[in-house]
Amino acid sequence: MRKSKALWGCVLAAALLLAACGSQEPKITLFSNEAFQTEADGKPVGIYTLRAGDVTMQVTNYGARVVSLWTPDRAGDYEDIVLGYETIDRYINNDGERFLGAVVGPYANRIAKGSFTLDGTEYNLPINNNGQTLHGGIDGLDRVVWDVVSASEDQLVMKYLHADGQEGFPGNLQIEMTYSLTPENEFRIDYSATTDKPTVVNLSHHPFFNLKGEGNGTILDHVMTI
């Protein structure tokens, strides 16, 4: 009888140990709110944390940037798979990669010679890349503070009004974008835009991924199937 009690005691202890292991929080390191709290262009800047499934993501409304994206690998070990800076100052002062994790636009990629004609009107834009206009010009969507419409556990909605004539582009362009995480560990980006006159729009996102985890070496041995 004593042996039976001892056996059940071992089983119970093992079960409790497994339960405790299964309920442990994933080992992730989040950027602090204090490191991203500031003001730019008269608007408040902060950082927002989203969680769903096994994924945790942090976004700042300065440039609508994804600054971290934590997800487990096949062994269950968590890594931050996007590159990002630890403080908002690094983004604002732009002492590194300008478009790191940001929304780019209102026209992503290059416009030859910084000029285009639309409905018979020629528009001239700032030149910022070897004689071309790149990713919206000198002050594109990556260098503005987005207004937060709503923030929940798994979704962040932001908007920005790109004014008529801003960086040379025609039309008041109202842009809304949504970052979402799903229970299936999906990371979604949804854009919408409306304008009050004909214009050119090509919105995009500029993350830098390292599926080994930030700081864990080169990506040259990555294999991607599309």
What residue ranges belong to the model's regions?
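An exposed, glycine/acidic-rich loop-and-rim segment of catalytic or binding clefts
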Residues: 22-226
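Intrinsically disordered, low-complexity segments enriched in polar/charged small residues
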Residues: 10-13, 211
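Bacterial N-terminal signal peptides that target proteins for export
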Residues: 1-10
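C-terminal motif of bacterial Sec signal peptides marking the signal peptidase cleavage site
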Residues: 18-20
